[in-house]
Amino acid sequence: MPFVNSVRGSFGSQGRFGFGSGLLISSTGGTITTAGSYRIHTFLIGQSGTNFTASGSGSVEYLIVAGGGGGGWGASSYDGNGGGGAGGYLSGTANVSGTSYAVTVGNSGTAGTKRTSGDGLGYGGNGGASSVFSFTAFGGGGGGTDSYNNNSGLTGGSGGGASCSGSSANNPQFSGAAGTVGQGNRGGNVLIGGGGPGGGGSGGGGAGSVGGDGTQNSNGGNGGSGLANSISGTSLFYAGGGAGSSWTNSGGTGGSSIGGNGAARVPAINGTAGTNNRGAGGGAGTSDYLSGQGGTGIVIIRYAI
């Protein structure tokens, strides 16, 4: 398991784990900035495959966030679909020596495409994994679609939300997909399947909470909340879930204002993408209104100077 010596949460002003000082000052890799008494290496998707090369031995802090899952999209009227799960979230400390460490940053999960009956294309895609040292954060799970066979989302760092098939009175409850222990949370559930128009899909899970549930004749479920972290020198939210969509009501709101919002027919709005470089999930689509892709991941390493 890649969670040894990892801590989920924020790095505040008292969280100076590093003792690197002058031993690490010549380290290379990523975009290098300073904030106060810290030197910070930031790796984004365009830098995937590059290395962090430590110039000496010391302790560093890290934040690893995978790519968020894309929102689900169906074709049928009345159906709300599931928001994408956030990318997996890991933070903690690691001891490094004077060597090079491969860094991978996860890409965004693709938005679900408008499916036709039985083609299986409506699911949002899973985000890509991010990794450094011996730790891997798994990509967020794609949001569920109104497939009428399995409306649940896909598993991932945080799981995708489920779709509500509001046009059929015989559809059962559907569960949000599971997240990875230590990295995220499950997607929301659909509490009532079918029985009338206006089913709301559930939100994708976030690093801070499960996705919001969807019900018949409801708004789409909100995306699960992300977690705030100040490792970059500024407190920012990462890994918020994407929101579910609704046919006759409002789409849900993305988690921590970084997850994508869910689509709705009234008012006519598309689902939106998760925020890039934050690993946020994409918002779900509904019928003629698009779903959003997930946000790209990020890896940040810092040490005291």
List PLM regions with ranges.
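Low-complexity, glycine/proline-biased repetitive segments and flexible coils/loops
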Residues: P2-I305
